[in-house]
Regions:
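Residues on the solvent-exposed faces and adjacent turns
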Residues: 18, 33, 46, 61, ...
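Interdomain boundary/hinge segments at the C-termini of tandem beta-sandwich modules
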Residues: 44-52, 149-158, 250-258
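Beta-sheet-dominated interaction scaffolds and their linkers
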Residues: 51-80, 158-187, 260
Length: 260
């Protein structure tokens, strides 16, 4: 008798099933002599099982990468505890609650909903340095384990928008010759993460004049037309910025001379 014990009278064998508890089990075996009816009682004992628990924590992502312009990222955590009986799994794993902590400039833990952690990053306006941080998720209770998810955000994206215009786009000269100033606007606008940063700044440019009777003046924004004694004539002034790829063409025309 006794939980977990059984016998085979024919061969005087007593068996014990695995003890599912962490306590010793006891029982008795009674042997009865068929002819005399005499009995003998044997005490039985079974050692307590070794019960342990193994914690496991994993994440569906090891790194969260954010845009420089800010944003949210979600990571899903799997956190379990497995009961082991004498070194073997016993039953199914159970869920273990977790807590999270975020470190790193610009990063914060926005929400935790069950196994899902949402991390936020503010805009990084630093033009030379990216940002890094961590999300450390730790199990609650005994045997707790932790997992670290790396956080990464690049440096700000810096770009320039170039503008080059002339008003008017066609300049006319009298036949007797004259010098005219070109009305040119040459600027660049800095953008950080796609947004304007500061005011536009001037960009140098060069002017190339072509056409009979036309030449560049003493500055990049002046054109000289010589005296024209013949038929009307045309030329052009090609203006190129010293940065970027912008260029414009200004048409030049001069009236015919009186002798034409």
């Amino acid at each position: 008798s006794g939980t977990g014990f059984s016998g085979n009278a024919e061969i005087s064998q007593i068996s014990a099933t695995e003890n599912p508890t962490d306590k010793q089990r006891t029982g008795t075996a009674t042997i009865i002599q068929n002819e005399s009816g005499k009995t003998a009682t044997i005490s039985l004992s079974q050692a307590a099982s070794v019960i342990t628990y193994e914690n496991t924590i994993t994440a569906n992502k090891t790194t969260l990468t954010f845009a420089a312009t800010a944003g949210d990222q979600v990571v899903t955590i799997t956190s379990t505890r497995q009961k082991k009986l004498n070194g073997k799994n016993s039953g199914s794993p159970t869920t273990v609650n977790t807590t999270g902590k975020v470190t790193g400039t610009g990063f914060s833990l926005k929400t935790q909903s069950g196994a899902n952690y949402t991390v936020s990053a503010t805009e990084n306006t630093n033009e030379t340095t990216g940002r890094t941080g961590t999300l450390v998720v730790t199990q609650e209770g005994s045997g707790a384990k932790s997992i670290t998810i790396n956080l990464s955000q690049p440096k700000a994206t810096v770009a320039y928008t170039y503008n080059l215009t002339s008003n008017p786009s066609r300049v006319e000269f009298v036949a007797t010759g004259e010098t005219k100033t070109l009305s040119i606007s040459s600027t660049k606008q800095k953008t950080v993460n796609g947004k304007n940063s500061g005011s536009p700044v001037a960009v140098n440019y060069t002017t190339t004049v072509s056409g009979t009777g036309f030449s560049k003046g003493t500055t990049e924004y002046s054109v000289v037309a010589a005296v024209n004694t013949g038929t009307a004539r045309e030329g052009s002034a090609v203006v190129k910025q010293s940065e970027g790829t912008k260029q414009i063409t200004i048409m030049l025309s001069q009236a015919a001379g009186t002798s034409a």
